[in-house]
A protein has these predicted regions:
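Short, low-order "capping/linker" segments at domain edges
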Residues: 98-106
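Conserved S-adenosyl-L-methionine
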Residues: 42, 96
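A short beta-turn/loop motif at secondary-structure boundaries
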Residues: 45-49
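Short amphipathic alpha-helical segments
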Residues: 14-40, 78-79
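A generic structural signal for alpha-helix starts
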Residues: 13-17, 61-64
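Short strand-loop junctions, especially beta-strand C-caps/beta-turns
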Residues: 7-13, 44
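An amphipathic, aromatic/His-enriched active-site/gating alpha helix that lines ligand/cofactor pockets
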Residues: 33-37, 52, 59-95
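Active-site-flanking beta-strand signature of metal-NTP-handling nucleotidyl enzymes
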Residues: 2-9, 55-56
Length: 106
């Protein structure tokens, strides 16, 4: 399993607008590409230096799906995000390979 993790630092003045944008526009557009099976929007807890930090995790169907997404769709979607929020929502991307997962012991 491959997780495409996008960490975004959002200015306090734009946090609510950014969350609405992600929920109503951006995430649906990303999922519409067919590259991902699900997603999570997480708030990073802890020290916040002048804003809020979020992690958006998309679980790819496969490495090939993620490769196609990053080559064919990501540039357009990232540009739309940057055009809308500029320096008020600065993102960086990480690809994670899940090597093991399982349920908690009873």
């Amino acid at each position: 399993m491959v997780v495409y993790n996008v960490t975004v630092s959002v200015s306090p003045a734009k946090s609510a607008e950014w969350l609405d944008f992600m929920r109503l526009e951006h995430v649906p557009e990303v999922l519409a590409t067919g590259a991902f099976r699900d997603y999570k929007i997480c708030r990073v807890l802890g020290y916040e230096d002048g804003g809020q930090t979020f992690a958006v995790q998309y679980v790819a169907w496969s490495s090939e799906h993620l490769r196609r997404y990053t080559e064919e769709d990501a540039p357009r979607l990232q540009a739309a995000h940057k055009n809308r929020f500029g320096e008020d929502a600065v993102a960086f991307w990480t690809v994670l390979e899940v090597i093991e997962e399982g349920p908690a012991a009873p």
